[in-house]
Amino acid sequence: MHIRFTKMQGAGNDFVVLDETQGRLGLTPAQYRFLADRHFGVGADQILTVRPSPGAGIDFEYVIHNADGGQVEQCGNGARCFARYVRDKGLTAQDTIRVQTMAGVIAPHLTADGRVTVDMGRPELEPARVPFDTTGLAPVSQGSGQKWPLALDGQASEATLLVAVVSMGNPHAVQLVDDVDTAPVAQTGPLIESHPRFPQRVNAGYLQIVNRGEVRLRVYERGAGETLACGTGACAAVVAGIRLGLLDARVQVHTRGGLLTIDWAGGLQDPVFMTGPATTVFEGEIDIPDAL
C-alpha cells in the first residue's frame, strides 16, 4: 500500500499524521507499528488520523494509535498538531474546531502567536474511573488531593511509591521526585505502566516542583515508552500538583522536548487548558507492506 503522510511534532512528541477525510486506509495494528518504527518505517511516538465529522456539532474525528499499534483515547500534544494540520491543509478555516476523540470532545484553538491551546476537558480524580484498583489500600491525604501507595514487584528493595492518579481521558500515575534528571524512569516506568492495579495500563509521570508556577516533567507513556513530551501527562501532573496544594492555577511545564503552559482553575468541573507549539517537520510518501 502506497500512502502519503505528514510528519509533525509538538514539544518533541512526534507524530505521523494521516488524512482519511476522503476514505479509510484500513491499516492494521502491524501496519501502524511499521509506520512508527524508527528503523524500518517513518518513526513516531503516535500515529494520528484525521477523519470527517462523525456527527452534528463536530468538525472532525481524531484517532490515535500508539507506537505499539494499539488505539488510545487521547493525546494532548497530538491534538495541537491535529489542529495545525487541518488548518494548514485547508480542511477548515476556523481558528477553533470541535474534535471527537475516544475520550470525548475537545476544542483546539489556534492562537495569534502560532501556538495552539486545547481545552482538554475536565480531569477525572475518582480512582475507579481512572481506572485504578484501590482494594486494600489507604490513601495519604495532602491538600485537597490524595496519594496512593503503589508497590513495585521485581524491585530489589520491593519499593513502594506514592502516586496521584488522574485521568485526562487516559490514565496517569504521577509521582513527585526531587530531580527528574536522576529519576529512574527507564527502570520503574515499565513496572508502573503495566502494574496490575491499572487494568488499562497507565502513563507514569515523574514530577519535579521548581516553584508554584513552574515544574519539570518526564513521562513514560503507555504503549510508547518515554517520550520527549506528553501533553495529557503535563495536564495530569499539574492537576495533581494543584490538588496536593503545591501549584498555582497557571504552570509552565518544562519537558525534554519543550515548554507547555497548563491552566486549571482547580474545580472538579473546570476544564484543563494546554498551550504549546505544533510544527510540521516534513511531508512524505511510503510503501507499507500488505503482509506484516
Curated annotation (Swiss-Prot):
Q: Which InterPro entries match?
A: DAP_epimerase_AS (IPR018510), DAP_epimerase_DapF (IPR001653)
> What is the protein's given name?
Diaminopimelate epimerase
**What's its job?**
Catalyzes the stereoinversion of LL-2,6-diaminopimelate (L,L-DAP) to meso-diaminopimelate (meso-DAP), a precursor of L-lysine and an essential component of the bacterial peptidoglycan.
Q: Which residues bind substrate?
A: 13, 46, 66, 76-77, 170, 203, 221-222, 231-232
SUPFAM superfamilies, per the entry: Diaminopimelate epimerase-like (SSF54506)
Q: How does it assemble?
A: Homodimer.
Q: Does Glycosyltransferase show up as a keyword for this record? A: no
What is the first-listed, main subcellular location in coarse terms? cytoplasm
Q: Where is this site: Could be important to modulate the pK values of the two catalytic cysteine residues?
A: 172, 221
Name the gene that codes for it.
dapF
Give the organism, scientific name.
Acidovorax ebreus (strain TPSY)
PANTHER family (alphabetical): DIAMINOPIMELATE EPIMERASE (PTHR31689:SF0), DIAMINOPIMELATE EPIMERASE, CHLOROPLASTIC (PTHR31689)
* GO MF terms, alphabetically ordered: diaminopimelate epimerase activity
Listed GO CC annotations: cytosol
Give the positions the UniProt entry annotates as the active site.
75, 230
- Record key words, sorted: Amino-acid biosynthesis, Cytoplasm, Isomerase, Lysine biosynthesis
**A Pfam cross-reference name:** DAP_epimerase
Give the catalytic activity.
Answer: (2S,6S)-2,6-diaminopimelate = meso-2,6-diaminopimelate
Its pathway, per UniProt, is: Amino-acid biosynthesis; L-lysine biosynthesis via DAP pathway; DL-2,6-diaminopimelate from LL-2,6-diaminopimelate: step 1/1
Q: Which family does it belong to?
A: Belongs to the diaminopimelate epimerase family.
Enzyme Commission code(s) on record: 5.1.1.7
UniProt KW Ribonucleoprotein keyword: no
